[in-house]
Amino acid sequence: IGAVVDRTSLDWDDPVEKWLPEFKGDAKGKILLRQLLSHTSGVRPYLPEPRVDNYNHLDSAIIEILPLDTVFTPGSRFQYGGLAMQIAGRMAEAAMGKEFETLFQELLAQPLEMKNSHFTPINTDGGHAPMLGGGLCTTLNDYIHFLSMIYHEGTYEGKRILTAETVKEMQANQVKDALVSPGEYTEIALGQSHTGIYGLGEWRELIDKKTGEAYQISSPGWAGAYPWINKRDSVYGFFIAHVVGSSAKEDGFSSFYGSPVISRTVSEIVK
């Protein structure tokens, strides 16, 4: 989505209704793109049960989201969830006139040489709408190219993929004055509380107390995927552990909340 912002008139402060007219007259129409990607939008975190998941495109996903009420005033609270990102993805599609998988391939995967990465794997069963929050199928080798680009402020192998301004915006505090309830990922995983826990699509794990800038960012997955970048230690990596069933094991270890142990261990080894 940042690549679309760089190339079109789509802006982080655009309301949903500017690009998706079906939201005009709906409370969700006034939500800003940056709120959708920072979990401060007020959109319900997930579809109610039983989830309707038999569509193949984001425009169909939007039809399921449109009737749902918001759960709080946009910008007033932080609540993690994936539905808002579906709306953001549809805004990007509207801005460039292409489906999300095509945008991903043309703007990121191809220039980053991510040859085995897709949001919509080829499958005759249907039901594979791009799930922006956790739906990327990739490999260690592919994803490390993406992390390298983010680490190098938007460049990869001498090619400009994202503007430095967009990368900075992604890593900036986007939660701002929104209420953060106790028990969020950063508090449980790191054993500390700080404001500005989230940017645009990424957690701000470790913060420089003097500047307020995040020097460690991440995007851990519930099933055991943990990509991170630590700018202070000049380290970035991607760890994958396949977890069957509950993320929390009988011995108390959680592949999700235990993720920062990996980044901390790697930094200690490198030092």
Please give the residue ranges for each predicted region.
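Cytochrome P450
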Residues: R77-Y80
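Well-ordered alpha-helical segments within folded domains of soluble proteins
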Residues: L83-G89, N141-H145
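Active-site Gly/Thr loop motif
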Residues: N116-N141, A172-F238
